[in-house]
Structure formats: structure tokens, C-alpha cells
Design a protein with these regions (language model features):
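Mid-chain, structured segments of secreted extracytoplasmic proteins
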Residues: 67-104
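Repeated loop/turn-to-beta-strand initiation elements of outer-membrane beta-barrel proteins
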Residues: 79-82, 135-136, 197-200
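Bacterial Sec-dependent N-terminal signal peptides
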Residues: 1-33, 136-138, 205, 224-235
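Outer-membrane beta-barrel channels and translocator barrels
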Residues: 25, 77, 89, 132-134, ...
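Extracellular/periplasm-exposed beta-strand and loop segments of Gram-negative cell-envelope proteins
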Residues: 40-63, 91-119, 149-181, 213-220
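Residues on the lipid-exposed face of transmembrane beta-strands in outer-membrane beta-barrel proteins
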Residues: 32-36, 68-74, 86-88, 123-129, ...
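Short glycine/proline- and aromatic-enriched beta-strand/turn motifs that initiate or cap beta-hairpins
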Residues: 19-71
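Predominantly the C-terminal beta-signal and adjacent terminal strand-loop region
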Residues: 175-177, 181, 189-235
């Protein structure tokens, strides 16, 4: 019995350290995610540009973009989690039924739907608060995103009056875009523990830029509403 007590005393610190190590490892998780987004913009402008804004509001419409990337989560305590990610983002909006001319010398007139695309590398920094923490878990997310501008492009679907159709890709580079933009990110999420290490998450998220797309007479602030789906694994 004495030997058993002595062995227990000797091994107690080792077991404690091992348990602490396991607990520390279980606080980290890493995952991949993808979010299809309903994307658009708000405009801020002086009163004397109202007529230009009215023209834009008639011809511009929301469009679909996406975010995709990886994220690392750290469980601070039972209900609070910090999340850091890196994502590729496509923000968009669209001009519909724009009157255009032909290409390559074709003078036939027609109509075009033109999608404008803005590409970013985004670094979201979030705090997740778990309101339910069982096999199914729910949480509220809030934070900021640091967005680095990459490039812009357009895709046009043209229909000419003679019935011909054409799809044209182009890079504009017309505006002097703000290279680094900070945005707000917020939403709610629902998760499910598939196993001890794996969980699936579905997160409706709202993203809003705090700075305009470019320095221009009419300031454009991009935003999106999406449903992010992610698979995470505890390390």
C-alpha cells in the first residue's frame, strides 16, 4: 500500500502536466470555409450629385460574390472563442440592360448585363460567444476584417439586336482603389459536433466596409450578406 501511495505521489505531477497539455491542445481548432454572398453597396454623396446617383440606382443591382479561406479558433473560456482567418473575397454588383455597341467593328447595337468584381484578401478577427454549447451549439459572432485590395475586373453578357451573344471579360483599373480597408463583420452561427474532433458550422454573416471603395466624388461602401459553411477540426 505504501508503494502504491508513493507511486501515486510521484506520478501525480506528470499526470497533471499531461492533462494540462491535452486541455491546451483542445483549445485550438482549424478549419476551412466557403460563403456565397449577396453583394451590393451604399452610396454617400453631396446634394449636387443627386441626378448621377439616381441614374446609378436605376441601372445598378445586387449580385453574387463569395468568400473562401481558412480560420483558426482558440477557446478562451467555456463560452468565448477568438477566431482569426484569411480569406479570398469577391465583392460584386451589377449593371443590367446597359445599351452598348458591337465589338471588332460590329456596329450592331444591343444590351448588356455587366458584373463588376472587386477582389480582396481579407483577415477577419472575430469573437464568438456560445449561447448553446451541447452536441448542437449556437453562437453570436462579431469583429472586424482587414481587407487588402488585389484587383478589379468586369464580366459582361452581351445580346446584340441581331440575336448574337457574347461574353466579355476585362480588367478596368480605372479608379484609384483604396488598398487597405477595414470592415465590420457580424452574425450568428449554428454548429454540430460530428465527432470529438470535428464540427460543422453554418453562419449567416453580414460584412460592411467602413471605408469607401475609392476616393471619388460619390463614395461607394460595399457590403454583403452571406451564409458561411465551415468544417473545423480540433488540434
Amino acid at each position: 500500500m505504501k508503494e502504491l501511495i508513493i507511486i501515486s505521489i510521484l506520478f501525480a505531477p506528470i499526470l497533471s502536466i499531461a492533462q494540462e497539455s491535452v486541455n491546451k491542445e483542445s483549445k485550438f481548432s482549424v478549419g476551412v470555409n466557403f460563403s456565397p454572398n449577396y453583394s451590393y453597396r451604399t452610396l454617400k454623396y453631396p446634394d449636387n450629385l443627386q441626378s448621377f446617383v439616381d441614374d446609378r440606382e436605376r441601372s445598378e443591382h445586387p449580385s453574387f460574390g463569395f468568400n473562401t479561406g481558412i480560420a483558426v479558433q482558440y477557446l478562451l473560456m467555456k463560452k468565448f472563442e477568438v477566431e482569426l482567418g484569411i480569406q479570398f473575397s469577391r465583392q460584386t454588383h451589377m449593371f443590367k440592360e446597359v445599351t452598348v455597341g458591337g465589338t471588332m467593328g460590329n456596329v450592331s447595337m444591343g444590351l448588356a448585363d455587366v458584373q463588376l468584381r472587386y477582389h480582396y484578401i481579407e483577415i477577419p478577427i472575430l469573437v464568438n460567444y456560445r449561447i448553446v454549447n451541447q452536441k448542437f451549439f449556437g453562437y453570436i459572432s462579431a469583429g472586424v476584417s482587414i481587407n487588402q485590395f488585389l484587383n478589379d475586373e468586369s464580366k459582361a453578357w452581351l445580346t446584340y439586336s441581331n440575336g448574337d451573344t457574347e461574353v466579355v471579360h476585362s480588367e478596368s483599373g480605372i479608379l484609384d482603389f483604396n488598398k487597405t480597408v477595414v470592415g465590420l463583420v457580424g452574425g450568428v452561427g449554428l454548429g454540430y459536433h460530428i465527432s470529438e474532433k470535428l464540427n460543422l458550422r453554418v453562419e449567416p454573416l453580414f460584412r460592411y466596409s467602413l471605408a469607401p471603395l475609392a476616393e471619388a466624388p460619390i463614395d461607394q461602401y460595399n457590403y454583403s450578406i452571406g451564409c458561411q459553411i465551415g468544417m473545423n477540426m480540433k488540434l
